[in-house]
A protein has these predicted regions:
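ATP/NTP phosphate-donor binding region
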Residues: 28-108, 289, 306, 330
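Internal gly/pro-rich beta-alpha loop/helix module
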Residues: 146-218
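Accessory alpha-helical/coil subdomains and C-terminal extensions
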Residues: 34, 40, 64-65, 70-75, ...
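Bacterial N-terminal signal peptides
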Residues: 9-18
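ATP/nucleoside-binding phosphotransfer catalytic cores, i.e., glycine-rich phosphate-binding loops
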Residues: 281, 285-354
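Short Gly/Thr/Asp-enriched flexible loops that form oxyanion-binding sites at enzyme active sites
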Residues: 120-142, 283-292
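Sec-dependent signal peptide cleavage junction
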Residues: 18-29
């Protein structure tokens, strides 16, 4: 009997030790990342201030990077943070010069072994464009994550603090290494190439069409299920170091009775054109005649959100298909292509691979 009691007591003590170990392992916050996350602030709604409780009529880009971080003290438990105020603007005022500054800053700071990743706070209107530009121009496998918000900081139930927290979690996660530039929004992780803003008001304003998100964040834990397959970051051939501007590319949108003379005007004032055609990149006969006469690179995209434009289905012989890129992302790739060889053969290759 005595041996039996001793055995039971020993078993109970062992179970208590196991239970205690499990609590310490799973019940405590994740260990703080040993590296540093650089938060690059550019403004946008996430830094917006307006009438208390309201979601409209606010001033974007009013709060600083330090203000945003101070509102989420839990971020300090994730990693050491360095804040950099790149600019403080509405994202509709983002320029190629700001893009180049972001790329230069990331490429320079990524060489610091203490830096583990980057978060860019940004307005949602043009977030997808900045993300794709950086996806093609930053030269690091370290995570680069964009985030923002649909509600200003002064609104009821502002979404910015959680989005910023989750973006830092992703930037500090090994799961995000080598995945290219990402967007983190409303618990979801999106690849830069496929992410797009799809709502003017919904806090779940980002989506990725037919491909969907590549992962999620849950209570600070990062789950990445897909790896982007198109060329990006360290494998990209584009080098923007030393550039202070980019070639000019205009986007034209075809519709019923759209004036074809707009094509001539745009061509005279641009280095290249992207045309958002109807359906699978189609136009009226009047547009086709003028497009065929243009002597600058022309990329054909679509007004449609999903689907692919292929070179064997183009109506104009001197154009190149955008594949699955939206008009605005096709314009970014064309602008970068125009910094080098912009032959039709090279453009076809780029739009298939990037």
């Amino acid at each position: 009997m005595k041996k039996h009691v001793i055995f039971l007591l020993s078993l109970l003590m062992a179970l208590c030790c196991i239970f205690s170990a499990a609590i310490s392992e799973n019940g405590e916050p994740a260990a703080r990342h040993p590296g540093k996350i650089v938060v690059l602030a550019t403004g946008g709604t996430i830094a917006g201030v307006g009438e208390a409780g309201k979601t409209t009529g606010y001033k974007p880009g009013a709060l600083t990077a330090e203000d945003l971080l101070a509102a989420v003290p839990e971020i300090a438990d994730v990693a050491e943070i360095e804040a950099v105020q790149v600019c403080n603007v509405n994202s509709d005022d983002i320029t190629a010069e700001i893009w180049l500054t972001l790329a230069e800053t990331i490429n320079r700071m990524a060489g610091d072994p203490e830096v583990a990743g980057f978060v860019i706070t940004h307005g949602t209107d043009t977030m997808e464009e900045t993300a794709y530009f950086l996806n093609l121009t930053v030269k690091t496998d370290k995570p680069v994550v964009l985030t923002g918000s649909m509600r200003p900081a002064t609104s009821l139930s502002a979404d910015g603090p959680m989005n910023l927290y989750e973006a830092v979690c992703v930037a500090a996660s090994e799961e995000a290494v080598g995945k290219g530039v990402l967007i983190v929004f409303a618990d979801r992780i999106y690849a830069a190439r496929t992410a797009a803003k799809t709502s003017t008001y919904n806090i779940m304003a980002l989506a990725a069409g037919e491909t969907g998100s590549i992962g999620m964040v849950r209570d600070g834990t990062v789950y990445v299920y897909e790896t982007p397959s198109r060329i990006h970051t360290t494998a990209s051939e584009f080098d923007v170091s030393g550039l202070t501007s980019l070639p000019k590319v205009s986007i034209l949108y075809f519709s019923v009775d759209a004036d074809p003379e707009l094509l001539r005007y745009a061509a005279e004032h641009s280095d290249g054109l992207v045309i958002a055609g109807a359906g699978a990149g189609e136009f009226s006969e009047k547009w086709i005649d003028i497009i065929n006469s243009l002597e600058i690179p022309v990329i054909i995209s679509s007004r449609i959100n999903d689907g692919v434009i292929t070179n064997d289905n183009l109506l104009c012989g001197n154009t190149v298909a955008a594949n699955t890129l939206s008009p605005q992302k096709a314009a970014i790739l064309l602008r970068l292509a125009l910094t080098g060889d912009a032959s039709r053969e090279r453009l076809e290759k780029l739009f298939l691979e990037y």
